């Protein structure tokens, strides 16, 4: 008589990328738990349902609230999130159990297929003045306006496939996406340019937590924590908690122009770069810190300290203006800036 398998319930968004990410998580967990059956519960969140409003206008928790309701009702045991979609302060009773090893956290340029096939444009610097760049991220638009003031930025919503189709068929010359999603879905060949903090990379810092997956559990659920613990990547968790501390201190949600870049130097030195850019790209406050970091608490203290320094140097003024715009409604539509 075969041993009855225990069932562990996983919550996720129902996009193709979210389901692919859950598949990767299950494939990594299964060898550690051969007698566990992982059952996936996929649902649409507010961000999935509303494909017309700009992301900033939808507020915080647009990718997570419905899933967390399932978690707290004990309908699922843990949720697989893109860490960058999670608010920096979780609802009471929720906890990040583990963070997985980070995929490449950078942003990338995907050119219109016609331009790529002709070899006409290979980077943002090649694009003519007035070229249209698709992005729904104020962080991406603000940073790129700083370096490429002649480009026009226009909202583009939808999943990866939808956005690439819009890029190819509509009036966009290129779109900006996270590398991690393209790599996980096997669309590597669409990447025309990698963006990072270097001059060649367009001076672009990525989103807080970008490229990492986080598993949210109920506070105190040690049983589920033990199940998912094999996937915890300590260096990624420490680095991303430093990034999240920056955003939490500056009171920025995922729809504000805060960019970060973390890198381990040697065995235990963490380098953290942060930029806060005005929506028109004309003002910015930048900072960086390098410290020996061995714990999450040290990482969070490092992020908080750097954020407080940036706030004193003008970052808070920039973010206050952004938040006033959100409160008044409509000021954060990408193409209107």
Swiss-Prot record:
Keyword Ribosomal protein: no
Keyword set, alphabetical order: Heme biosynthesis, Porphyrin biosynthesis, Transferase
InterPro entries: HemC, Porphobilin_deaminase_cofac_BS, Porphobilin_deaminase_N, Porphobilinogen_deaminase_C, Porphobilinogen_deaminase_C_sf
This protein's pathway: Porphyrin-containing compound metabolism; protoporphyrin-IX biosynthesis; coproporphyrinogen-III from 5-aminolevulinate: step 2/4
Primary enzyme class: transferase
PROSITE patterns, per the entry: PORPHOBILINOGEN_DEAM
Record PANTHER family: PORPHOBILINOGEN DEAMINASE
NCBIfam families per UniProt: hemC
Function: Tetrapolymerization of the monopyrrole PBG into the hydroxymethylbilane pre-uroporphyrinogen in several discrete steps.
Protein name per UniProt: Porphobilinogen deaminase
The species this protein was found in: Neurospora crassa (strain ATCC 24698 / 74-OR23-1A / CBS 708.71 / DSM 1257 / FGSC 987)
């Amino acid at each position: 008589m075969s041993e009855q398998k225990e069932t562990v319930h996983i919550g996720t968004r129902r996009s193709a990328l979210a389901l692919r990410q859950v598949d990767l998580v299950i494939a990594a967990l299964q060898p550690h738990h051969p007698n566990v059956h992982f059952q996936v519960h996929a649902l649409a969140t507010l961000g999935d349902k509303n494909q017309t409003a700009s992301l900033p206008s939808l507020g915080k928790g647009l990718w997570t609230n419905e899933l967390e309701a399932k978690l707290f009702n004990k309908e699922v045991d843990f949720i697989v999130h893109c860490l960058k979609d999670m608010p920096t302060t979780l609802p009471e009773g929720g906890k990040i159990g583990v963070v997985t090893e980070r995929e490449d956290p950078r942003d990338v340029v995907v050119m219109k297929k016609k331009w790529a096939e002709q070899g006409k444009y290979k980077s943002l610097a090649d694009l003519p003045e007035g070229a249209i760049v698709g992005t729904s991220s104020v962080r991406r638009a603000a940073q790129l306006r700083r370096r490429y003031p002649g480009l026009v930025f226009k909202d583009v919503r939808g999943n990866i496939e939808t956005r690439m189709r819009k890029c190819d068929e509509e009036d966009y010359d290129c779109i900006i996406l996270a590398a991690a999603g393209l790599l996980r879905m096997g669309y590597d060949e669409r990447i025309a340019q990698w963006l990072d903090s270097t001059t060649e990379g367009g001076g672009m810092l990525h989103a807080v937590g970008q490229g990492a997956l986080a598993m949210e559990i109920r506070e105190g659920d040690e049983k589920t924590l033990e199940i998912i613990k094999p996937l915890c990547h300590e260096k990624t968790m420490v680095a991303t908690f430093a990034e999240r501390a920056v955003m939490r201190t500056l009171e920025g949600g995922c729809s504000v122009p805060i960019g970060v870049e973390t890198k381990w130097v040697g065995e235990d030195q963490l380098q953290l770069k942060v930029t806060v850019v005005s929506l028109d790209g004309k003002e910015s406050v930048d900072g960086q810190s390098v410290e020996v970091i061995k714990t999450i608490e040290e990482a969070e203290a490092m992020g908080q300290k750097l954020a407080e320094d940036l706030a004193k140097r003008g970052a808070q003024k920039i973010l206050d203006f952004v938040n006033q715009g959100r409160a008044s409604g409509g000021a954060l539509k990408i193409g209107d800036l």
